[in-house]
Amino acid sequence: YGKRRHPKKLTPLAYKQFIPNVAEKTLGASGRYEGKITRNSERFKELTPNYNPDIIFKDEENTVMNQWPGVKLRVTEGWDEDGHHLEESLHYKGRAVDITTSDRDKSKYGTLSRLAVEAGF
């Protein structure tokens, strides 16, 4: 005990690269489609809120910090009910998230994607 693991080198994801390398709505990536979760459904209560102060949530209804000091993770879309996605979108189930960084530097997106994969998203 007491041994510190060396951090592994993170390889940025390429634009439009998926982990696993299949489309997000396939059975292997996201499981069986179980229907849209609406605000009034019982399953809505199963969604877990995230109150992490290091994440800026875009308010459409009115681990990044360690990689880029002073930069925060910006969630632009998570669970959604507005109907702007495809019928079986994972956003309606609370199983998809769109993210950027607070500085909106697109050169960081590949590494940001890799960090999300490493975090289990």
UniProtKB/Swiss-Prot annotation:
Superkingdom field: Eukaryota
The UniProt record lists the keyword Ubl conjugation: no
Pfam families named among the record's database cross-references: HH_signal
Keywords attached to this entry: Autocatalytic cleavage, Calcium, Cell membrane, Developmental protein, Hydrolase, Lipoprotein, Membrane, Metal-binding, Palmitate, Protease, Secreted, Zinc
Subcellular location: Secreted; Cell membrane
Keyword Methyltransferase: no
Protein name: Sonic hedgehog protein
Biological source species: Trigonostigma heteromorpha
Lineage, opening ranks: Eukaryota, Metazoa, Chordata, Craniata, Vertebrata
